[in-house]
C-alpha cells in the first residue's frame, strides 16, 4: 500500500494498551508507572493478552512486589487486565472516539525513532513466511 519495503513499515501494535496496563498497575501498586515492566500482546482489543509471566516492578515479580508493599491497594490482576481491555469502550461512551489515546501512542513511537532511544515497544509489523504465517500484521 505505502510502496515502502515491509521492513520499513510498522503499526502502533499494543503500545496504547501496554501504556494503560503500566499506568493501572502503577496506580494500584503505588509506584511510578515507569518502574512497571509489563506488556499487552496480540491485537488491540478483545483478544489482547497481558503477559503476566514477565511482568515486574523494577525486576521484582508483580505478586512478590504486591506481597511486600504495605501501602498497596488490594489488587486483582484479572480486573486490571479487564479494565485495560475494556477501556476503549469506556472512552468511546464518554467522548465518542479514542483518537487522543492512539495519537499519544503514535507520538511515543515517533519520538522513540527520532531520538534513537533504542526503546522496546510492542509495535506491529508485517509477517510473510515467518513462523509459518503469511500476509499478516502482528504485534
Which residues are covered by each model-predicted region?
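Rossmann-like NAD(P)(H) cofactor-binding subdomain of soluble oxidoreductases
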Residues: 1-22
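Long, compositionally biased stretches enriched for glycine and/or charged residues
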Residues: 26-139
Amino acid at each position: 500500500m505505502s510502496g515502502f519495503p515491509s521492513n520499513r513499515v510498522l503499526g502502533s501494535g499494543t503500545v496504547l494498551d501496554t501504556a494503560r496496563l503500566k499506568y493501572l498497575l502503577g496506580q494500584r501498586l503505588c509506584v511510578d508507572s515507569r518502574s512497571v515492566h509489563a506488556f499487552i500482546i496480540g491485537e488491540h482489543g478483545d483478544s489482547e493478552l497481558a503477559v503476566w509471566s514477565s511482568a515486574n516492578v523494577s525486576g521484582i515479580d508483580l505478586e512478590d512486589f504486591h506481597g511486600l508493599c504495605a501501602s498497596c491497594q488490594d489488587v486483582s490482576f484479572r480486573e486490571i487486565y479487564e479494565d485495560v481491555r475494556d477501556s476503549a469502550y469506556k472512552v468511546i461512551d464518554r467522548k465518542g472516539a479514542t483518537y487522543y489515546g492512539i495519537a499519544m501512542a503514535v507520538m511515543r513511537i515517533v519520538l522513540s525513532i527520532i531520538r534513537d532511544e533504542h526503546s522496546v515497544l510492542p509495535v506491529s509489523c508485517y509477517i510473510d513466511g515467518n513462523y509459518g504465517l503469511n500476509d499478516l500484521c502482528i504485534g
